Structure formats: C-alpha cells, structure tokens
Amino acid sequence: MPGGRISHIEFPADDMERAKRFYRAVAGWEPEPMEGFDDIEFFQTAHEEGGAIGRRGVGTGQVVRAYITVPSLETSLAAVEEHGGSVIEGATELPGMGRFAVVLDSEGSEVALWEDVAPAG
C-alpha cells in the first residue's frame, strides 16, 4: 500500500516578485493569488501536484516545506511524538479545504502533515 503522497510544497521568499520570476523561468510555474490568502501565491504542475511561493515567515515558514497527505491528522501527530519527532505548529483548519500541522521529524527536518476535508454528504 502506498504511503502518504506529497500534496504540495512551499518555497519561502524574501522577495516575492523575484522568486516568482525565477520559478516562472526555471520551472514554467505561474503562481497566482488565492482569495483569503495574503503573502502567498499558488501554482500547479503539469502532473497536478502544486505548491506555493510565499513571503518568508509570513505566508510560509522559514524553510522549504513539503506537505504530506495523511488519512488522520490526529493519528499521524501521535506517531510523530512516538517516533522521536515533535509538533511545532498544532492543527490548523483551512475551511472547506482541510487541516494541517507542522512537525519536526526524528532528524530535525520540518515537514507538514495535511488531512483533506471530508467530502460533504
């Protein structure tokens, strides 16, 4: 059974316009703003994965952050602590989208765990 997929990745930027120009030229990504999100713009790849470029420490964290989709945020957060990691930002809900938390893995790398919102009905 495959494990959690990388749902998206965030790139922190000190200069948003410079970073957007860089990723447009290098990767062909077209970051676009999304209503309700300041200091961060989102892009989609040709393979449907996506990501974001955000103002460092405001729209994103301080380092590149991968988001791993998990079936249960609570179960995964418990596993983080049981296996030598730590939670640095508890569960945060993005209404209509899902929930995420930011953790340090057993080696000190920062990753985020993402749980999709349950389908209506």
Residue ranges and their predicted role:
Residues 1-20, 48, 64-66, 116-121:
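N-terminal beta-strand motif that seeds the catalytic metal site of vicinal oxygen chelate
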Residues 8, 42, 52, 90, ...:
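Conserved beta-strand positions that form and line the central face of beta-propeller blades
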Residues 8-44:
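N-terminal first-folded block
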Residues 10, 30-36, 89-94, 117-121:
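Conserved catalytic-core motifs of GNAT/GCN5-like acyltransferases
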Residues 16, 68-110:
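Vicinal oxygen chelate
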Residues 29-62, 106, 110-116:
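Conserved short beta-strand elements that form part of the metal-binding/catalytic scaffold
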